[in-house]
From Swiss-Prot:
Keywords in alphabetical order: Abscisic acid signaling pathway, Cell membrane, Gibberellin signaling pathway, Membrane, Metal-binding, Repeat, Transferase, Transmembrane, Transmembrane helix, Ubl conjugation pathway, Vacuole, Zinc, Zinc-finger
PANTHER family: RBR FAMILY RING FINGER AND IBR DOMAIN-CONTAINING
GO MF term set: nucleic acid binding; RNA-DNA hybrid ribonuclease activity; ubiquitin protein ligase activity; zinc ion binding
Pathway: Protein modification; protein ubiquitination
Cofactor note: Binds 4 Zn(2+) ions per subunit.
Protein residues bound to Zn(2+) 4: 321, 324, 339, 341
Notes on the domains: The RING-type zinc finger domains mediate binding to an E2 ubiquitin-conjugating enzyme.
Protein name: E3 ubiquitin-protein ligase RSL1
Zinc fingers, RING-type class: 159-207, 159-208, 321-349, 321-356
EC number(s) stated in the UniProt entry for this protein: 2.3.2.31
Organism of this sequence: Arabidopsis thaliana (Mouse-ear cress)
């Protein structure tokens, strides 16, 4: 959410920065928070440092107490318009009303926060980017943490992906549904690879199928990756059987056949991106003054461009998806590939997933030989078990 879009014209807009801290030191739970209210130019107008003596308090509770205190002070100072600068995704969602608190203590604190906001003309929740969060630490958190009563050492975490054990706690990423944690850099690289593969963006943890969301991970990615993710989300909303691709090789934009049908009559369609007309039935550029049957009769063989594409595909060992006819090139990795239409097939032979034995360690897999080898191995294990049993019996009765 952009502040400039919601800032009333001619009205001064203030910023509220808040941060809660909880740590366990010498078998004692220490907690405290800092608050800073800044002007338009991020000049510090007010700061507050408070320690909390409660062995049962949680970090989320401390963060909300800090926010509540900051809003109270803003009202006391006569401020009417203020931005609530959040660096905690869940708190941002709570204040925006996107998420609902599960714990009663959090619900009570959130109720107080929303009640105080009613005394302000406008209070805009803003989710800080990583760079903005660093700036917030520079002129707000650092300005108050040096005077805060508790002394909290930098907490280090270990990433389960890269195994780096010297990562600051605020650089760790937690997957909402599974709770798995890894460093932000590993999450970023994982999402980038998944986007380039066209695969589902799941938790980076091994064999975890929990889905990641762009809202949760957007601040970790570049604008280009965010745009790719946004487009991928839109594409996934189109049913597989309703997908149609622009035949223009320089475009290949994915579209919904149902939506295109509502804009045109007959089989002539126009690409929503490049504008080139095409036949939705033949999946080729528009054949003027020819019906589909007439076009197929006059063009029984592939066009010159189709022939070039076929020769290039043979030369590069490309595979064509049997479902949507899209060409796919595998540069590296597993030979079981997933087309952008969702169809999975073997890159080596082109068969549908599960219909061949490629990728099992041998390309010339012989089932008879395989079964024979397995039987020999089992027989070998049985012989070893018998020998071990005989030795144990001899030792027992000798």
């Amino acid at each position: 959410m952009e502040e400039d879009d919601l800032n009333p014209a001619g009205k001064p807009l203030y910023r509220l920065y808040f941060k809660g801290l909880v740590t366990e030191e010498k078998e004692m739970l220490l907690a405290g928070f800092g608050v800073a209210i800044c002007g338009d130019k991020d000049d510090l107008l007010f700061d507050l440092k408070v320690s909390i003596h409660d062995p049962t308090i949680t970090l989320l509770e401390v963060e909300l107490i800090a926010l509540k205190s900051g809003l109270n002070q803003a009202v006391s100072l006569g401020i009417n318009h203020i931005s609530i600068c959040c660096d905690h995704e869940y708190i941002f969602e709570l204040v925006m009303g996107i998420s609902t608190p599960k714990q009663e203590s959090i619900a009570l604190l959130l109720r107080d926060v929303q009640g105080i906001r009613k005394y302000l003309t406008s209070s805009i929740p803003v989710m800080l980017t990583q760079n903005q969060s660093n700036l917030a630490y520079d002129f707000a958190i650092e300005a108050i943490s040096s005077e805060i009563i508790i002394d909290i050492p930098a907490q280090k975490e270990t990433c389960n992906i890269c195994l780096n054990d010297d990562i600051n706690a605020d650089q760790m990423f937690s997957v909402d549904k599974s709770g798995h944690m890894c460093c932000s850099e590993c999450v970023k690289r994982h999402i980038e690879v998944r986007l380039l593969e066209g695969s589902l963006i799941t938790c980076p943890h091994y064999r975890c199928n929990s889905l990641l969301t762009s809202v949760r991970c957007g601040n970790l990615l570049t604008p280009k990756l965010n745009k790719m993710w946004e487009q991928k989300t839109k594409d996934e909303l189109i049913p597989v059987m309703d997908r149609v691709y622009c035949p223009n090789p320089r475009c290949s934009t994915l579209m919904s056949e149902t939506e295109l049908s509502g804009l045109n009559i007959g089989v002539r369609r126009c690409c929503v991106k490049c504008g080139e007309p095409f036949c939705v039935k033949c999946k080729v550029s528009w054949h003027n003054n020819l019906s589909c049957d007439e076009y197929k009769t006059l063009h029984p063989n592939p066009t010159e461009n189709d022939g070039r594409l076929r020769d290039l595909a043979n030369e590069k060992s490309w595979r064509q998806c049997s479902k949507c006819k899209h060409m796919i090139e595998l540069s590296s990795g597993c030979i079981s590939v997933v087309c952008r239409c969702g169809h999975t097939f073997c890159y080596q032979c082109g068969a549908d997933a599960g219909d061949c034995f490629h990728g099992l360690g041998r390309d010339d897999l012989d089932l008879t030989q395989c079964c024979g080898s397995c039987c020999c191995f089992v027989f070998f294990l049985v012989i070893i078990a018998i020998v071990v049993t005989i030795i144990l019996l001899v030792r027992r009765f000798s």
